[in-house]
């Protein structure tokens, strides 16, 4: 297709896990959005959280976080201009961390063939204003009308 990943949803976490399991078993690059504790243990490596932890930029993010921790520890001993510069560095580091995390998430979602989520989870801010060429709702008759609209209204084109 070339227009980005498909969004595959279901009302329950169990149903989403069943979708994800089937996709993973046939070799589809699928990413599961949602809290990892609600995802079947055998599928947790396909969660966005797990993929973020494994991403090569995660080392850089951790390094910057460690720099911030070190700077914060030293703040009490700093005075005047040095303290102001340290605060500026901490603020800039937080911006860098946020940008790196956004880039990692965007790269992971862009590279997926299918993004899996519950119908309500499809409204998660992490998907932002992302558009999908196809939105699939498995077992749609089991979903309430309001929850079935969440993946359809803001994200499809």
Task: Give, region by region, the residue ranges found by the protein language model.
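Short glycine-dipeptide loop
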Residues: 2, 154-157
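Conserved P-loop NTPase motor core of helicases/translocases
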Residues: 2-9, 14-135
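SF2 helicase catalytic motif II
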Residues: 116, 130-148, 157
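GG-anchored amphipathic helix commonly corresponding to the ABC/SMC/Rad50 NBD signature/C-loop
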Residues: 120-124, 145-148, 152-154
